[in-house]
Amino acid sequence: MAIPITVLDCDLLLYGRGHRTLDRFKLDDVTDEYLMSMYGFPRQFIYYLVELLGANLSRPTQRSRAISPETQVLAALGFYTSGSFQTRMGDAIGISQASMSRCVANVTEALVERASQFIRFPADEASIQALKDEFYGLAGMPGVMGVVDCIHVAIKAPNAEDLSYVNRKGLHSLNCLMVCDIRGTLMTVETNWPGSLQDCAVLQQSSLSSQFEAGMHKDSWLLGDSSFFLRTWLMTPLHIPETPAEYRYNMAHSATHSVIEKTFRTLCSRFRCLDGSKGALQYSPEKSSHIILACCVLHNISLEHGMDVWSSPMTGPMEQPPEEEYEHMESLDLEADRIRQELMLTHFS
């Protein structure tokens, strides 16, 4: 059972009722354009979030000194979409930077609690077949139920001794594993992996790999780039294509895999706290992981609500560390190589 959280307005406690308080900011008093520019989401979507998260963000007995769920949601959206605790963001809704930080923490945890509600892999055959049909219609790649990749998000150094979060560029980061469908809906998100881990190691240790290795999704596969090992359930591109069929396979693979690359750019453009433009996330790895997951939940909710997430200008994620390519290891999985060869022979010859 979720435990409701009350955030007290520090400004009200310090200065009394004469100081401007959160509850004086009303959504109905501002324009839709203002809400989009400041918080990145339209009015009705914000109202939906307040209703969805309200039980977590307020106590059963309303206290006059508690920050309203509405204001907590606005504070969190302001941070997610700007990547900053700038004074102007707090001033816009009448709270201090300290209060805003607590609002972000509480909304983040409330969204993380609901991650499984909005980020889920399809289980029924009809939904899986629909995914395959949609991906096939995109570039002619059969059997695909999702595309997988990893993205690094910069975080502050946990401590001087811990090098596990230092990636190949010498920066501290989390390496986040994600799978999306053709619309950019995230079906799997794992945000807790340290930046020193290569993509292939993240996937190998993930719950996603365990599911596919256990045979939960037979006759289906994911598409991954050359930073992953070829598997019976994970098709990767050929390192050096030679035949026309191999070239056609690689072209279809690239066109299909580009969906998740676009999804990453969209995520980081909408949620600027992830793109590194305002610096690394100034939190512990655990809290940073939760913030990333909360943004992914919001991304999926906005897609469910029919929001156009692709039209905003795309800035892209932080510069990603280079990955090793593992095509020279593919021969270790002879069955996976056989499946890919059969795929090329049947569909790309």
Curated annotation (Swiss-Prot):
Q: Where does a divalent metal cation bind?
A: D149, D199, D225, E261
Please verify whether the record's keywords include Hydrolase. yes
The record's EC number reads 3.1.-.-
Q: Where in the cell is it found?
A: Nucleus; Cytoplasm
Question: Do the record's keywords include Ubl conjugation?
Answer: no
Cofactor(s) recorded for this entry are: a divalent metal cation
Tissue note: Detected in brain, eye, nerve tissue, kidney and lung.
Any single GO molecular-function term of the entry would be: metal ion binding
Q: Which Pfam families match?
A: DDE_Tnp_4
Residues covered by the DDE Tnp4 domain: 148-300
* Primary localization class, coarse: nucleus
Chain's role: Transposase-derived protein that may have nuclease activity (Potential). Does not have transposase activity.
Annotated protein name in UniProt:
Putative nuclease HARBI1
> Which organism is this entry from?
Homo sapiens
Name the gene behind this protein.
HARBI1
